[in-house]
A protein has these predicted regions:
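Accessory RNA 3′-end/elbow-binding domains used by RNA modification enzymes
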Residues: 1-23, 29-46, 50, 54, ...
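RNA pseudouridine synthases
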Residues: 2-208, 212-238, 348
Length: 365
């Protein structure tokens, strides 16, 4: 696995979000490293890991926006996935060694196809809604300070506790695709590939969803492809590839004066993520000094944007490797973005202790 090449930025990138369409075969950390080089700054982080095999939307924060990322971690996500029925692997995806070849013969005839579709629809329905999901054992979850995947590689039997997640929808994209896989002795094993669109809460493991679908159908399964298409209000169609971003930086170095890596301004990102609260000069000054406002000030906030980040603000620490949010209890529910009269993003605020208080000040005094 080679690291992506990236041009070195001539000037430091502005604070903001960077939407990258991650290619397969590179880690999320590799993308962060490339962004640091292109943005000429060490202050770059991401809002949730994608496995090396996966492609799609990776949201990076540059400069002060790294602090904003905490409030994106809990956003809902959408994926396009391919699941292979009839074969299991140790990692529950195509990167791991196969562990079982149960096979999934293609249904023949109208009656068999209808029966298969009925069982598939029922299995998908059982996996939709608020469910308890056992995360993949080969994951970055820590057990007594040691990553679960390391324990598995060291030969341990790992049993992770089920966690609550919400699967908003699972849509079948096209008809099931019967195909053939090679068995342990080179024999032909009939399998079926399913293309799915999954809309889910943060913390969902699509690999585990594939595993559980295979178990529900009695044939086993694993994930063969995964692409993240949205995070909260942001879509992969807005993202740039690493090569495109690098070419932009290289070209900008020759401008007079030189220009740097383009980012999505924090104010624009906040308006897309949260209801907007327009502050007076006095209110903005108070917030910049860390003071609260009367709680009824929050009632002036506008309507929540479409696909807004309605998840609670995260105040506990999160894992930098797996990107899953820790639960901050009631803290941060009903977050709004406060803007001064000049349109500058001052802070994210929420109701706390009977006051509207800042949970993140982005434009200090």
């Amino acid at each position: 696995m080679s690291r992506p090449q990236a041009a070195r930025g001539a000037v430091t990138a502005d604070d903001g979000l960077l939407l990258i369409d991650k290619p397969a075969g590179v880690t999320s950390h590799d993308v962060v490293a490339a962004a640091r080089r292109m943005g000429a700054t060490r202050k770059v982080g991401h809002a949730g890991t994608l496995d090396p095999m996966a492609t799609g939307l990776l949201i990076l924060g540059v400069g002060r926006a790294t602090r904003f990322l905490t409030h994106l971690v809990g956003a809902d996500k959408t994926y396009e996935a391919t699941v292979r029925l009839g074969q299991e692997t140790i990692t529950e995806d195509a990167e791991g060694e196969p562990t079982a070849w149960r096979g999934c013969p293609a249904p023949s005839g109208q009656d068999e196809r209808a029966a298969f579709q009925g069982r598939l629809d029922a299995a998908l329905a059982r996996l939709t809604g608020a469910i308890m999901q056992v995360p993949s054992a080969v994951s970055a979850i820590k057990i007594d300070g040691v990553r679960s995947y390391k324990r598995v590689r060291d030969g341990e039997d790992v049993a992770l506790a089920a966690r609550p997640v919400t699967i908003h929808a699972i849509d079948l994209l096209g008809a099931p695709r019967p195909t053939i896989a090679a068995g342990p002795a080179g024999e032909q094993v009939p399998v079926v590939d399913l293309d799915l669109r999954v809309s889910c809460s943060s913390g969902t493991y699509v690999r585990a969803l594939a595993r559980d679908l295979g178990e529900a159908l009695g044939c086993g399964a694993h994930l063969t492809a995964l692409r993240r298409t949205s995070v909260g209000p942001f879509d992969v169609d807005e993202a740039r590839g690493l090569a495109e971003a690098s070419a932009e930086v290289e070209s900008g170095a020759n401008d007079d004066p030189p220009s740097g890596l383009r980012t999505l301004p924090l104010a624009e990102a906040a308006r897309r993520c949260f209801p907007a609260l327009e502050l007076s000069h006095d209110e903005a000054r108070a917030i910049r000094y860390g003071q609260g406002l009367p709680s009824d000030a929050l009632a002036r906030a506008g309507a929540a944007p479409e696909r807004s980040v309605t998840a609670k603000a995260v105040t506990a620490s999160r894992s930098a490797d797996d990107g899953h949010a820790a639960d901050g209890g009631d803290e941060g529910r009903g977050v709004v973005a406060g803007f001064d009269p000049d349109g500058i993003l001052v802070a994210l605020l929420t109701r706390k202790g009977g006051r509207a208080r800042p949970v993140l000040v982005l434009s200090p005094a």
